[in-house]
Amino acid sequence: MPPLASWLGKPYPPLCGVFTDIDDTLTTDGAITPDALQALADLKAAGLSVVAITGRPVGWSEPFAAQWPVDAIVAENGAVALRRAAEYLNEIGLHRLSNKRWQLSKSYQQAPAIRQQNYARMQQVLAQIESEVPGARRATDSAGRETDIAIDHSEFTHLPQDAIDHAVRLMRAAGMNATVSSIHINGWFGDHNKLEGARWIVRELWERELDAEMDRWVYVGDSTNDQLMFQHFEHSVGVANVARFVPQLQHLPRYVTQGERGAGFAEVARAILANR
């Protein structure tokens, strides 16, 4: 992977925004670092759109959607979006959250009946994985999940690769999508994923088609569940700790930072702003 420095100075259309993963891309040891938080603010101050797309649950994401300088957080691998309160509500789309202090709205890609049906099926698969895969335990943030399930492999416990592969096989055998992030194994029913979530949020927020302006967006990530984004974004960047997942990636990021995690994201932001 070429270093990020090789991207500088190349001609490309003016950028309009940045999509970013959260865990181990914005965060370091589970928390966003001051330099990464300032990088988000600097990008927004420069007039760029900023959207975080994560496998984390919507419940976990709520305080960050309210507090971070981002336009939205798309959680649960593209299924749910959180943004500051909108002017309208509808049955499938936006629902005002009960905590008015945060003033957020939540939108879904799936209708309520489908979400309810899928949730029951996912809990059965989750129980099966915990029963059949030695050491497998649901992620500690599972209570905040509405449209997917997650098995912890590197956040508070460690699963060997064969156990990770076993859990993925069980999810896929049940008809679920399955991806592996830097900390969790995520599974869900539906056609959504990070890329579809990005397309969706661009339509929702700006009434534009992402595919028509893909060369004006940057994506920053760190693991195997980012590879669909690495594949489709011309300006895709891996923070340095993506090296851990390179043997498992079919599609690599176009560039890689020197810094890891939040420091790597801050490096990307500086490069973007230096080229404006």
Regions found by a protein language model. Name each.
Residues 8, 13, 33, 195-276:
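Mg2+-dependent phosphoryl-transfer enzymes with acidic/Ser/Thr/Gly-rich catalytic loops
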Residues 20:
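Active-site T/S-Asp motif of two-component receiver
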Residues 31-143:
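Active-site phosphate-binding/coordination module
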Residues 68-71, 91-93, 156-157, 197, ...:
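Short, hinge-like loop/turn segments at secondary-structure boundaries
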Residues 68-69, 77, 174, 232-233, ...:
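Short, structured coil segments at secondary-structure junctions
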Residues 124-232:
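Conserved acidic, metal-coordinating active-site core of Asp-based
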